[in-house]
């Protein structure tokens, strides 16, 4: 049976036969205490534990001394321990400083079995540094055993390519040194991790700069949005003032008006009276007032247009631009006016003998557009989308006029049918 031990003096692990542990006869693989300190001989080959190799003379391997060590695992043979170490199944506890004491003994290291050596990396140290120090320890022991006189400037890595031709254990020495492949693999992994860390730091710095730029742009965008809203308010107020100064229609030459009749035609007079009765329109210029103010149960929409307060609140919960525009047109003009009007005053092309109807008041159409604009501006700030949705106002009002005329015709048919019965 073999034991995987860790010597406390140099924190190096070896796979040794259990016969190297003094006063230790395990009955199973779990019959040990990993917190207990055992006395272990270093150099199992010199103890003659192997049945096929006879014991050597003291002049060949020197006097062996006991060393303090911890047993980390037991196995039936060395290959099981090797597989457990490579698969990281053996947990190595932290080294306690209480176990490491100065005993005053002169330690003479014999030839170690280094075929399976596990280097425990201390916290905060690089893998290459740990392997480098372990190689230095191997060089020191080889100097003491073989009488080599290596200078302090000798690189520990030369042990991999240098060998002592006079020793009998040339093959065992090549197997005993820490595998160069393991050292190079650890070094490559460390360099790869350093490269990945450098890339991550560069990516982090690039992301931080992008966030700073986006924050600046967002701040500028917020300032532009506030400025645009302020300009919109000023534009609407300017439009109200201009519409009040111009009156209900386009500018008219006063000299022509005086030379012609002073009173409007009966048809126009009736039209003005209808609009006045339905939407409370005040054609006379009035002081500029803010929009959407309440007064005596009515809401001011601008340019002297007033609508019922209750109907206005019901309109605000209407879904969709089409329904909102149609209901607002009914509130401003009324169904009686809309059924006898057209949006632009141009006769339809569907009928050859169609007579054009009077157009709707341009300034009232502008009020409808402004109300719809205020509604859309609460949903989006995209000017392209706002312009696209506002361009459909005439279409919505035209559809409403057609619906009113259609319902009137259906009502007339029902009445005619009822009279015939």
Swiss-Prot record:
Disulfide bond annotation, renumbered to this chain: none
Coiled coil spans: 180-243
Cross-link (Glycyl lysine isopeptide (Lys-Gly) (interchain with G-Cter in SUMO2)): 258
Entry's Gene Ontology cellular component terms: Golgi apparatus
The BEN domain, residue ranges: 302-408
Keywords: Acetylation, Coiled coil, DNA-binding, Isopeptide bond, Repressor, Transcription, Transcription regulation, Ubl conjugation
Keyword Transcription regulation: yes
Pfam families: BEN
Domain of life: Eukaryota
Residues where N6-acetyllysine is found: 133
GO biological process: negative regulation of DNA-templated transcription
Gene Ontology molecular-function annotations: DNA binding
InterPro entries: BEN_domain (IPR018379), BEND5 (IPR040391)
PROSITE patterns listed in its UniProt record: BEN (PS51457)
Note on domains (UniProt): The BEN domain mediates DNA-binding.
Job of this protein: Acts as a transcriptional repressor.
Protein name per its UniProtKB record: BEN domain-containing protein 5
Organism annotation: Homo sapiens (Human)
Encoding gene, per UniProt annotation: BEND5
């Amino acid at each position: 049976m073999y034991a995987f031990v860790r010597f406390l003096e140099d924190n190096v692990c070896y796979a040794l036969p259990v016969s190297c542990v003094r006063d230790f006869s395990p009955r199973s693989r779990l019959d040990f205490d990993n917190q207990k300190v055992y006395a272990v001989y270093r150099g199992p080959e010199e103890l003659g534990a192997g049945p096929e190799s006879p014991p050597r003379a003291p002049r060949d391997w020197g006097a062996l001394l006991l060393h303090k060590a911890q047993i980390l695992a037991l196995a039936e043979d060395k290959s099981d321990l090797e597989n457990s170490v490579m698969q990281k199944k053996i947990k190595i506890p932290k080294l306690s400083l209480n176990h490491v004491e100065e005993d005053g003994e002169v330690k003479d290291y014999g030839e170690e079995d280094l075929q399976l050596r596990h280097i425990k990396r201390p916290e905060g140290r690089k893998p290459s540094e740990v392997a480098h120090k372990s190689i230095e320890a191997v060089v020191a022991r080889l100097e003491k055993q073989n009488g080599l006189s290596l200078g302090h400037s000798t690189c520990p890595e030369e042990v991999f390519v240098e060998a002592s031709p006079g020793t009998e254990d040339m093959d065992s020495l090549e197997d005993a040194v820490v595998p160069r492949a393991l050292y190079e693999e650890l070094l490559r992994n460390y360099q790869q991790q350093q490269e990945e860390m450098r890339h991550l730091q560069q990516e982090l710095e690039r992301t931080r700069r992008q966030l700073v730029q986006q924050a600046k742009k967002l701040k500028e965008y917020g300032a532009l949005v506030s400025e645009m809203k302020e300009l919109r308010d000023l534009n609407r107020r300017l439009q109200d003032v201009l519409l009040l100064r111009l009156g209900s229609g386009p500018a008219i030459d006063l000299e022509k008006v005086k030379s012609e009749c002073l009173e409007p035609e009966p048809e126009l007079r009736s039209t003005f009276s209808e609009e006045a009765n339905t939407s409370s329109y005040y054609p006379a210029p009035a002081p500029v007032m803010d929009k959407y103010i309440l007064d005596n149960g009515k809401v001011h929409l601008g340019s002297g247009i007033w609508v019922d307060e209750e109907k206005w609140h019901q309109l605000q919960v209407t879904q969709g631009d089409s329904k909102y525009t149609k209901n607002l047109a009914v509130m401003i003009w009324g169904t009686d006016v809309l059924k006898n009007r057209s949006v632009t005053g141009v006769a339809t092309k569907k009928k050859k003998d169609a007579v054009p109807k009077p157009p709707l008041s341009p300034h009232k159409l502008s009020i409808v557009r402004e109300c719809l604009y205020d509604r859309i501006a609460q949903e989006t700030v995209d000017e392209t989308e706002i312009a696209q949705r506002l361009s459909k106002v005439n279409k919505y009002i035209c559809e409403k006029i057609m619906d009113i005329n259609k319902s009137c015709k259906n009502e007339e048919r029902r009445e005619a049918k009822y009279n015939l019965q």
